[in-house]
Amino acid sequence: MTSPVGLGMPEGPAAVLAPRRKTRQLQVGSVGVGSDFPVSVQSMCTTKTHDVNATLQQIAELTASGCDIVRVACPRQEDADALATIAKKSQIPVIADIHFQPRYIFAAIEAGCSAVRVNPGNIKEFDGRVKEVAKAAGDAGIPIRIGVNAGSLDPRLMQKYGKATPEALVESALWEAGLFEEHGFGDIKISVKHNDPVIMVEAYRQLAAQCDYPLHLGVTEAGPAFQGTIKSAVAFGALLAEGIGDTIRVSLSAPPAEEIKVGTQILQSLNLRPRKLEIVSCPSCGRAQVDVYTLADEVTAGLEGMEIPLRVAVMGCVVNGPGEAREADLGVASGNGKGQIFVKGKVIKTVPEAQIVETLIEEAMRIAEEMEGDSTTGSPVVTVS
């Protein structure tokens, strides 16, 4: 008897994700960072930090979007002078981002920031100031993030490796961490960012194998919204699926709140965050008998802000439509100018095409009310197809 052909599929169900890599635990203000805590989502303000009102307004918007920790730039003395007010009034922990001038590190610590990010590649004579920084941060009880970036790597390492290789990024980070450890300071988080997701992933893999510091994931200078989303999703997905990564920041040339939406969705897609509204929709084809794109967009807009985990399916034809709709909490299979509305796999009504969106939104709201009053809520999803 001929043996079956192997198709490379697992013989049994495989674990969705590897276990989280074990790390030391840190506190960034009220947010725990490390393997004992959920992966947190960060962003960075685009305002001038010395414009306190604008910065606090943007932090409020980020907080409303689900941001856990926010970073602010501190390139000038007037920015350093604003840190105390911002740190005090922010609803979420504030990290000061320091480049070039070491004196701003001490200003940020004195101002009450929850952590400080330092770039060892461009801070003047940084190695010689580590002892002072370690003492100041230790006395204040705040962590330091060593943020190595391919675009500002130490010239000595550029000369050694020729370019920003994974090995160069890792060596820079671990060298600086070692200096802090020599002075008795171990509340350290590390990032090794590169704009190439492949190099970035390899750098983090090497780093994860050589230390137990919590790791902040980021693809630096990822680009405009679409390109940056793809780069970050590819890199973060690879690492988080291996259990690597404790905080993330999706870097986009877009409003900061968009970074939070993308980052949160990445975590939800990996089941690292509870799912909320999920809309599943088909890509459409010649079989579609309705405008699936418009239908999906209108349903999404109508349910924006829904916090209940709900899966909604919007399907454009009878091939996959009924099956997908039955698998969702709520769905529609469209065709011939009408739509069959499914709830929990059962057809509850058929409505004219013009009433599909209105009906789906009404049913979603009704289901949401029921789920809010039900302590045994599962994790429903919305699928548009």
Swiss-Prot record:
Residues bound to [4Fe-4S] cluster are 282, 285, 317, 324
Q: Does the keyword Oxidoreductase apply?
A: yes
Give the record's cofactor note, including how many are bound: Binds 1 [4Fe-4S] cluster.
Q: Which cofactor does it need?
A: [4Fe-4S] cluster
Q: Name the Enzyme Commission number(s) assigned to this protein.
A: 1.17.7.3
Name the Gene3D superfamilies on file. Answer: Dihydropteroate synthase-like, Sulfite Reductase Hemoprotein, domain 1
Named from the GO MF annotations, one term is:
4-hydroxy-3-methylbut-2-enyl-diphosphate synthase activity (flavodoxin)
What are the protein's UniProt keywords? 4Fe-4S, Iron, Iron-sulfur, Isoprene biosynthesis, Metal-binding, Oxidoreductase
Regions that span the bilayer: none
Pfam families reported for this sequence: GcpE
Q: Which reaction does it catalyse?
A: (2E)-4-hydroxy-3-methylbut-2-enyl diphosphate + oxidized [flavodoxin] + H2O + 2 H(+) = 2-C-methyl-D-erythritol 2,4-cyclic diphosphate + reduced [flavodoxin]
* Pathway(s) this gene product operates in, as recorded in its UniProt entry: Isoprenoid biosynthesis; isopentenyl diphosphate biosynthesis via DXP pathway; isopentenyl diphosphate from 1-deoxy-D-xylulose 5-phosphate: step 5/6
Q: At the top level of its lineage, which domain of life is listed?
A: Bacteria
| Gene Ontology process terms (BP) | isopentenyl diphosphate biosynthetic process, methylerythritol 4-phosphate pathway; terpenoid biosynthetic process
What family does this belong to? Belongs to the IspG family.
Query: What does it do?
Result: Converts 2C-methyl-D-erythritol 2,4-cyclodiphosphate (ME-2,4cPP) into 1-hydroxy-2-methyl-2-(E)-butenyl 4-diphosphate.
**Protein name as catalogued:** 4-hydroxy-3-methylbut-2-en-1-yl diphosphate synthase (flavodoxin)
> Which gene underlies this protein?
ispG
